[in-house]
Amino acid sequence: MTTDTIVAQATAPGRGGVGIIRISGDLATNVAMAVLGKVPKTRYADYCDFKDADDRVIDQGIALFFKGPNSFTGEDVLELQGHGGQIVLDMLIKRVMQVSGVRIAKPGEFSEQAFLNDKLDLTQAEAIADLIDATSEQAAKSALQSLQGEFSKEVHELVEQVTNLRLYVEAAIDFPDEEVDFLSDGKIANALYRIIAKLDTVQDSAKQGSIIREGMKVVIAGRPNAGKSSLLNALAGKESAIVTEIAGTTRDVLREHIHLDGMPLHIIDTAGLRDTLDTVEKIGIERAWAEIATADRVLFMVDGTTTDAVDPHDIWPDFIDRLPTRLGVTVVRNKADLTGESLEKSQEQGFDVYRISAKTGLGVEELKQHLKSLMGYQSNLEGGFIARRRHLEALELAASHLQLGKEQLEVYLAGELLAEELRMAQMALSEITGKFTSDDLLGKIFSSFCIGK
């Protein structure tokens, strides 16, 4: 843990009404004496002159002092709130750095100090950056939920349950004559099943939180000439893709990034899927399947003039069978202007079905509302927590260890191996909040923050 005293501009660079300089560390009181001639009363706004080394006034403003550990970073913190001119702020930072032992903060170092001093866990620290970077009200609300500890609470509950079960299993191992009875009486199995079910729920919520933060990747897929490129253009609100009556016009992957009520949506238009001898088209089809493999949702585009079927298993069973497990699919029956179909949404064998005309725009707004709901949009803004890709990976790793532990229990009654899988699951979960985290990961996370945060 660093013992340096750090300084940085806490407000955005450039011209503004107010500019804030933040200092954190043991030398914050030395800085106060040098710049203000006194240490302000803790947690009181003090109007002061900010002076240079020759006792000349650089600026005038509000000084705030927070005595550690009752501060954001857990250290002594001094904030100087002056006028927002960049030259004045630069002069003030230079003055602060004339105090021996003070240096410029690295990006995210204030938040890192808060984490290292147990003022925040890692998910809460990340939520600060996510709140700043939020591109929608929903993302901001979810980031605030994480900052207030909603995600951490879920993870801590899982860690506690895994730890308690691990201790119970290890206690059984310590009594080898009774180990088999302990493992086979159903108590351990039931506890493990409850943990796995709880983790599944948290994973679903985290995936939703990741979509709110990073956006949802939606791949438009289907046979040639189903209207995929027309739908891309309709969703994007511009002519992004070339549209013709010639099957196979789209040979490569086309991408559009749009916002629906501020929520990011990444739309991927792909080549029509079919058997072909054309080398270039084959490459496009391979790329289409690669995009589908990493999608959050597939819009299965169907030419409504070629079939009356609505169940995707009836329309194209080979396509549905090849899709990744648990990948959500929305069936989009296109050309409703020609078929005269009702635009009402329906459900077929668990699949959402929408009727639209990508050419005229009929039903497109309803499809947009559907995509918004999939991204977790809620008009009352009572959304869940925000999540990052690393959180999803850690949850997936924990889930895999729990599944392996389940196998060790059910098939082999192997207590020691079950305990080891529980230990690995515990470590994976604890990495989310930073209980067990490498220095490399901390550096990567906090270096992406703003300087001054």
Curated annotation (Swiss-Prot):
Mg(2+) binds at residues 229, 250. GO terms for cellular component: cytosol. Transmembrane segments: none annotated. InterPro entries: G_TrmE, GTP-bd, GTP-bd_TrmE_N, GTPase_MnmE, MnmE_dom2, MnmE_helical, P-loop_NTPase, Small_GTP-bd. K(+) binds at residues 225, 244, 246, 249. It is found in: Cytoplasm. Its cofactor is K(+). GTP binds at residues 225-230, 244-250, 269-272, 334-337. It holds the Pfam family MMR_HSR1. It comes from the Bacteria. The keyword Plastid does not apply. Binds 1 potassium ion per subunit. GO terms for biological process: tRNA methylation; tRNA wobble uridine modification. Residues 215-376 form the TrmE-type G domain. Belongs to the TRAFAC class TrmE-Era-EngA-EngB-Septin-like GTPase superfamily. TrmE GTPase family. Exhibits a very high intrinsic GTPase hydrolysis rate. Involved in the addition of a carboxymethylaminomethyl (cmnm) group at the wobble position (U34) of certain tRNAs, forming tRNA-cmnm(5)s(2)U34. Homodimer. Heterotetramer of two MnmE and two MnmG subunits. This is tRNA modification GTPase MnmE. It comes from Shewanella denitrificans (strain OS217 / ATCC BAA-1090 / DSM 15013).
